[in-house]
From Swiss-Prot:
SUPFAM superfamilies: P-loop containing nucleoside triphosphate hydrolases. GO terms for molecular function: ATP binding; tetraacyldisaccharide 4'-kinase activity. It is an enzyme of class 2 (transferase). Its EC number is 2.7.1.130. This is Tetraacyldisaccharide 4'-kinase. It catalyses: a lipid A disaccharide + ATP = a lipid IVA + ADP + H(+). The lineage of its organism: Bacteria, Pseudomonadati, Pseudomonadota, Gammaproteobacteria, Enterobacterales. GO terms for cellular component: plasma membrane. ATP binds at T55, A56, G57, G58, N59, G60, K61, T62. The keyword Transferase applies. InterPro entries: LpxK, P-loop_NTPase. Belongs to the LpxK family. Keywords: ATP-binding, Kinase, Lipid A biosynthesis, Lipid biosynthesis, Lipid metabolism, Nucleotide-binding, Transferase. HAMAP family: LpxK (MF_00409). The gene is lpxK.
Amino acid sequence: MIEKIWSGESPLWRLLLPLSWLYGLVSGAIRLCYKLKLKRTWRAPVPVVVVGNLTAGGNGKTPVVVWLVEQLQQRGIRVGVVSRGYGGKAESYPLLLSADTTTAQAGDEPVLIYQRTDAAVAVSPVRSDAIKAILAQHPDVQIIVTDDGLQHYRLARDVEIVVIDGVRRFGNGWWLPAGPMRERAGRLKSVDAVIVNGGVPRSGEIPMHLLPGQAVNLRTGTRCDVAQLEHVVAMAGIGHPPRFFATLKMCGVQPEKCVPLADHQSLNHADVSALVSAGQTLVMTEKDAVKCRAFAEENWWYLPVDAQLSGDEPAKLLAQLTSLASGN
């Protein structure tokens, strides 16, 4: 229902306009206070790159963060990552991730980023505290990437990157809750890079698509082409589950059942195992896999995806960030 409201297919969005105006008024006032220096920002001693969204819902932001971290690491840059840690609840903050950190403590996306990149990752409701924790333990970190936080204006940033779903784009264009917008589309004029996940990019936007890899067994780590798996039940607890189901079909998989879950939804063995019957195979996202690995069964697999950016702009962006991190 919410997708139909935000896309404009349902007329119910008009009923929510008063709340949207209030949201826009408050969020605009907050940003104005920071622009006029009525509210103080905090600046880290190293460059900060924000990777965020203008809209609520999944846009492919986490794969972009992983791509960015890996690309900088390949260039010899030591990277730290900070996040709010949505879906997690630590005993205390800031929390610096380790091999023993669970998604219940840190949230699924920070754990995924940590496992994929081996970068220093910290979570905290106050992102400046997370940055301080990283730099205290890893003083050699040269640049910080913040996963989300475009609207967290208390944190000064050197580069802003926005990720857009190229198919859904901005829906009906209204602020939450009548539409999907955290900020209006005009905000794009002030950011450094706009990455468009799928669809048809517009002038100045960087095209991106998600490239699926081989399916990975949660228990054994065995890999195979996902099309070889039979009697598949697909599960996705991400911001936009239909994208994952479409990816499976693109790979030649016709799921017997597709199960969309809420983003950051907590999972347990009983609930997940109930999704599959005897002889069926469960295929989930990598983001779900980090929550399920501890209690996985032999017929559970996940399909990793990697962000693939095209054109000349990614190289220019990476050169800019490498120069920033190197102090040039």
